[in-house]
Amino acid sequence: MAQRQSGYQRQPDDVYETPTWVTQIIAPYCRHVWDPANGPASRLAQSLRQTGFEVVATNDDFLARASLPHDRIDAICTNPPYGNGGRLACQFITHALELTPTVAMLLRVDFDSGKARTNLFRDCEHFVHKIVLLDRIVWFEREDASGP
């Protein structure tokens, strides 16, 4: 399925801040998290902290990391960069699962439906469930935007 052009200019380094309400949906699933795709001041890291998470947020080369930042991390939670065709997001998911079995990724609703990704979802022993957001995430500041 082809993606439509949004009409918005692409953000530098693909930085699209995650709204607070999205973070609160994953709150019951983990407490000590690492967000490897944002700096400490990111909205996702701040929202996780406000919800009661202990958060390590980094923005270095995640794919080059051989281990978790410390042994108290029980999950990797991030809005990964997508890259062309979602390839970079797939690399993020694969590497995150190599580091820890508990991973929460903010992805397009249809991201798990591709045949090339069955190893990450259908055939992955760690895949428990998919949380589908009923409200659309607004990634850009807009006056006419709706949502929580």
What is the meaning of each model-derived region?
Residues M1-P148:
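Class I S-adenosyl-L-methionine-dependent methyltransferase catalytic core
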